[in-house]
């Protein structure tokens, strides 16, 4: 994961100071690319401990086409909580619930969750129902039928419904590329929180590549991560500085249940991460 640490150093050394939408302030660079060879290990960050359980659950949530946080919080995944809670606080339904009380009610009250837990037509909706099109199914089908196509694309960016999303897609589009029996994937990400988001995204889309490879009978090769605005929030600089002083550990190994070849059939127990060693947890506040 030296590529990630190089990104961190480049932003600290060359990043421009910017005032962002959240008013937190960032150091930012524009147009950056990292490459990860999955044959050399699974690119899960080792310079801080990653919550891989959350990565799996969120990816399954996307694949299912779900956009409501109820599934996530029922599985103790809390990375999306702030956005529906913020909307709830600004609504006429607000009853002075704390964030934790709000989440507890999402878990136990299905009707409440249906009203207040939805994030709008974000990733899962766009992947599985982009103006009526199941892009994920079409992508896998096209890889099987026409592997050398230059149109092996999936996008989460639909300008007609951006205003209906609580957070417009940051990781916008993927493109797959097949060479012989190997498949690679490039992600274009318009905006990347380098401390909290980018490590998560690297692992998530690398895992998606492994899944798609298994569903198409190919071998996962390279994940290429292209970022538009790559930024470190001012309140994350100390954590980043700690990480770049650490020597990365050997990458873990990721395996799937070999009997699953239908992307709709994967469950949490079909994923197996082996030999993951990391430094300790580094916490940071998400900018909403």
Swiss-Prot record:
Cite the EC number.
2.1.1.45
User: What's in the keyword line of the UniProt record?
Assistant: Cytoplasm, Methyltransferase, Nucleotide biosynthesis, Transferase
GO MF: thymidylate synthase activity
**Could you tell me which pathway this protein works in?**
Pyrimidine metabolism; dTTP biosynthesis
Subcellular locations according to the entry = Cytoplasm
Q: State which residue ranges cross the membrane.
A: none
Report residues binding dUMP.
21, 150-151, 190-193, 201, 231-233
Q: Which Pfam families match?
A: Thymidylat_synt
Q: Which GO terms describe its cellular component?
A: cytosol
> Which superkingdom does the taxonomy of this entry point to?
Bacteria
Per the UniProt entry, the disulfide pairs are: none
Q: Which reaction does it catalyse?
A: dUMP + (6R)-5,10-methylene-5,6,7,8-tetrahydrofolate = 7,8-dihydrofolate + dTMP
Subunit: Homodimer.
Its job: Catalyzes the reductive methylation of 2'-deoxyuridine-5'-monophosphate (dUMP) to 2'-deoxythymidine-5'-monophosphate (dTMP) while utilizing 5,10-methylenetetrahydrofolate (mTHF) as the methyl donor and reductant in the reaction, yielding dihydrofolate (DHF) as a by-product. This enzymatic reaction provides an intracellular de novo source of dTMP, an essential precursor for DNA biosynthesis.
- Supply the name of the protein: Thymidylate synthase
The gene from which this protein is expressed is: thyA
């Amino acid at each position: 994961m030296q590529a990630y640490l190089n990104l961190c150093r480049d932003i600290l050394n060359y990043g421009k100071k910017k005032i962002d939408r959240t008013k937190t302030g960032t150091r930012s660079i524009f147009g950056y690319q990292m490459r990860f060879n999955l044959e050399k290990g699974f690119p899960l960050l080792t310079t801080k401990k990653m919550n891989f359980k959350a990565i799996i659950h969120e990816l399954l949530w996307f694949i299912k086409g779900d956009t409501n946080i109820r599934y996530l919080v029922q599985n103790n995944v809390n990375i999306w909580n702030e956005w529906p809670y913020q909307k709830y606080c600004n609504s006429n339904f607000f009853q002075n619930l704390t964030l934790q009380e709000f989440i507890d009610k999402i878990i136990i009250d299905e009707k409440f969750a249906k009203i207040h837990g939805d994030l709008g037509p974000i990733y899962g909706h766009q992947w599985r129902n982009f103006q009526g099109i199941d892009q994920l199914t079409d992508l896998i089908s096209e890889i099987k039928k026409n592997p050398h196509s230059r149109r092996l694309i999936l996008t989460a960016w639909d300008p007609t419904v951006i205003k209906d999303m609580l957070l417009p897609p940051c990781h916008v589009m993927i493109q797959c590329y097949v060479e012989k029996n190997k498949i690679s994937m490039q992600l274009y990400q318009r905006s990347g929180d380098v401390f909290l988001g980018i490590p998560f995204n690297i692992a998530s889309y690398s895992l998606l590549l492994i899944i798609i490879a298994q569903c198409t009978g190919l071998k996962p090769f390279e994940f290429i991560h292209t970022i538009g605005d790559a930024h470190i929030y001012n309140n994350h600089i100390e954590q980043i500085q700690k990480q770049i002083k650490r020597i990365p550990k050997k990458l873990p190994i990721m395996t799937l249940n070999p009997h699953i070849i239908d992307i709709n059939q994967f469950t949490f127990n079909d994923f197996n991460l082996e030999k993951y060693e990391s430094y300790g947890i580094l916490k940071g506040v998400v900018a909403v």
